[in-house]
Amino acid sequence: MSRIGNKVIVIPAGVSVEVNGATVTVKGPKGELVRSFNENITLDIAENEITVKRPNDTKEMKMLHGTTRALLANMVEGVSTGFSKALEMIGVGYRAQLQGTKLVLSVGKSHQDEVEAPENIKFVVATPTSIVVEGISKEAVGQTAAYIRSRRSPEPYKGKGIRYVGEYVRRKEGKTGK
C-alpha cells in the first residue's frame, strides 16, 4: 500500500501557501497556482511544512489522501522550479518554429499545424527539430506535450514522427518481398 499521503511537503524559501476552505493558493517566484481539493481532507501548515490528513481510513479517503498530497507537492515544485518536457522530431522536412506564442509544425501534411500556447505554458525551439514545453503546472505541461506529440505520433516502420526525448519507439519489420 502506498504511503505517499503521509509524507510531509517542505515549502521552499520564496513560496507561500494559503488555504481558504477547500481552495489552496500557492505563490512562488515562477507564478501562482490555485486548486480546489476535497473539503474532508485537512491541510496543516506549520512553518515551512505542509501535512495532509484524512478524517478516517475508508478506501475513498485513502485514495484522496495520496492524490491530494501529490497534487499539492507538484504545485509547490511548479511555482518554485517549474516543469519541462522535451520533444524531438524525426523525419525528412519535419520542423518546428515559433510565431509569437504559437508553435508552427511542419510534419509532412499538406498544411502546417499551429499549436497555441495555453496559459502559463511557454515553448522553446532551440533547433528546428527540438521542442521544449515549459510551465508551472505539471498537468498542463504534460497535456500540451502530449497534444504536440499527437500531431504526428511516431510510426513503427521508420520511426518518423514527434516523440519525447528518450522515448523508445517499438519498431516493426516491413513486408518481405517475393
Curated annotation (Swiss-Prot):
- Please give the GO cellular component terms listed in this UniProt entry: cytosolic large ribosomal subunit
SUPFAM superfamilies of this UniProt entry? Ribosomal protein L6
Does DNA repair count among this protein's keywords? no
Q: Which UniProt keywords apply?
A: Ribonucleoprotein, Ribosomal protein, RNA-binding, rRNA-binding
Question: What InterPro entries would the database entry show?
Answer: Ribosomal_uL6-like (IPR000702), Ribosomal_uL6-like_a/b-dom_sf (IPR036789), Ribosomal_uL6_a/b-dom (IPR020040), Ribosomal_uL6_bac-type (IPR019906), Ribosomal_uL6_CS (IPR002358)
Q: Which Pfam families match?
A: Ribosomal_L6
Which GO biological process entries does UniProt record here? cytoplasmic translation
Q: Does the keyword Transcription apply?
A: no
Q: Which GO terms describe its molecular function?
A: rRNA binding; structural constituent of ribosome
Q: State the similarity comment.
A: Belongs to the universal ribosomal protein uL6 family.
Q: What is this protein for, i.e. what is its function?
A: This protein binds to the 23S rRNA, and is important in its secondary structure. It is located near the subunit interface in the base of the L7/L12 stalk, and near the tRNA binding site of the peptidyltransferase center.
What assembly does the database describe for this protein? Answer: Part of the 50S ribosomal subunit.
Fetch the NCBIfam families from UniProt: L6_bact
In Swiss-Prot or TrEMBL terms, this protein is called: Large ribosomal subunit protein uL6
